[in-house]
Amino acid sequence: MSTSATNGTHYEQLHQGRTKMYKSKVDVVLGAQWGDEGKGKVVDMLASDVDIVCRCQGGNNAGHTVVANGTEFDFHLLPSGVVNEKCVSVIGNGVVIHLPSLFDEVLKNEAKGLQHLENRLIISDRAHLVFDFHQHVDGMQEAEKGGKSLGNGVVIHLPSLFDEVLKNEAKGLQHLENRLIISDRAHLVFDFHQHVDGMQEAEKGGKSLGTTKKGIGPAYSSKATRNGIRVGELLGDFNLFSEKFKSIVATHVRLFPSINVDVEAELARYKDYADKVRPYVKDTICFLHTALRNGKTILVEGANAAMLDIDFGTYPYVTSSNCSIGGVLTGLGLPPQTIGEVIGVVKAYTTRVGDGPFPTEQLNDIGDLLQTRGFEIGVTTKRKRRCGWLDIPLLKYTSLVNGYTCICVTKLDILDTLPEIKVAVAYKKPNGEKLDHFPGTIAELGSIEVEYAVLPGWQTSTEDVRNFKELPENAQSYVRFLESELSVPVRWVGVGKGRESIINVH
């Protein structure tokens, strides 16, 4: 056999080995609008059949509500999959973690019945920490901007995580210690990150981006400028951790002289947190790749949503991380070929929290009705959400970026009382010319006119329907219209709060 033939065979063998090295795929659930689409409920439904559920980006600035066995759990850092005692939950390296918030979240959910997280929660050693001063600066920056709010942002605030766990354990969530995993590469959010977060917002004076003041932006800023502190460093030589902590505090004090950080008290607190978080931490990259090679099923729960992505959202009214499909890869250390289904979650109308452009917003009785019937209050911010009609150009854009393989439409029942329903089908320039792309700047988006299609309502309750064919004909037509416009199949339709209210269309 010639050398070239031998080399060709060797290449083919290696190539086939690389393409077939994984026995399973990673399915991803992403918000297709500005958040609050109901991703947590979809993840809760799908998590009953998977081995591992992951968070890959953001921090405790995003909120999910999951109803399980009649108990309502609120999650901010914890993946929604923790309610399933049979699966492991992973907080990946792309998350920023405020440890006080993490522990607070654990405690609150333990009080709701969530148990044994130490056996089923894994935190990446590469995740960055959010400190309290990050949160203080966050508020300062927001205040500086003056009024306008940017919305929302995984980095881990450990106190918040454990508080969330405790609260949900009290509601019945059990055995988390066996099924929650946090990446050892996830960054930590410290209390000072949160302090800084508020300061930065305040200093901006006029325009406000609507930070949740959880320190997410400042923590990602620390990460990007390479002076952030990761979970793994907290668990290593504490003297080295102390030196880095003092250095990062000094940097923030120089930038924001009004922040006050009791360094020694914080170090004592984090020495205690190190012992508390240690059982959860490991190399999540190795863990996930081993799981895929062994055929384990993995589900990724996206935080925030596509239109809040720092690159593809309505910048600057966005969060500080990539919450589109790319963030899944970088936030968990996965290659593209591991991605399977990409599920876009679409609310049957559109909402957003805080300021920023919103082409289909209804500042009228329709908006009030959607807000009231949909109980559109932010889980994290407690602010009323702005409401408007479904926006097809926006959804086409986020589908383009994320490559949805199917869609779940949620909260269809909120439209039950309307005699007619509008859907945005095109954007027009002021001269009447239709746009063939989604505007890339706030100025351009603010100048567009919206063209609507008017569809008949059904004025019948859908809350108790559990079969797609039993939905009112006009409700079915509404779903099919969305499917046709996006050229993406609708796989599920939600008509209520619990997982049992999600209808399998096919």
UniProtKB/Swiss-Prot annotation:
Magnesium recorded as keyword: yes
Stored InterPro entries: Adenylosuccin_syn_GTP-bd (IPR018220), Adenylosuccin_syn_Lys_AS (IPR033128), Adenylosuccinate_synth_dom1 (IPR042109), Adenylosuccinate_synth_dom3 (IPR042111), Adenylosuccinate_synthetase (IPR001114), P-loop_NTPase (IPR027417)
Name listed for the protein in its UniProt record: Adenylosuccinate synthetase
Binding site for IMP: 36-39, 61-64, 212, 226, 304, 319, 383
UniProt keywords, alphabetically: Cytoplasm, GTP-binding, Ligase, Magnesium, Metal-binding, Nucleotide-binding, Purine biosynthesis
Binding of GTP, residues: 35-41, 63-65, 385, 411-413, 494-496
GO biological process terms, semicolon-separated: 'de novo' AMP biosynthetic process; IMP metabolic process
Catalytic site: 36 (proton acceptor), 64 (proton donor)
NCBIfam families: purA
Class of enzymatic activity (EC top level): ligase
Reaction(s) this enzyme catalyzes, per UniProt: IMP + L-aspartate + GTP = N(6)-(1,2-dicarboxyethyl)-AMP + GDP + phosphate + 2 H(+)
Main location: cytoplasm
KW NADP (keyword) present: no
Subcellular location(s) per record: Cytoplasm
Cofactor binding, per record: Binds 1 Mg(2+) ion per subunit.
Family: Belongs to the adenylosuccinate synthetase family.
Domain of life: Eukaryota
GO CC entries: cytoplasm
Involved pathway(s): Purine metabolism; AMP biosynthesis via de novo pathway; AMP from IMP: step 1/2
Subunit structure, as described in the record: Homodimer.
Chain positions recorded as substrate binding sites: 379-385
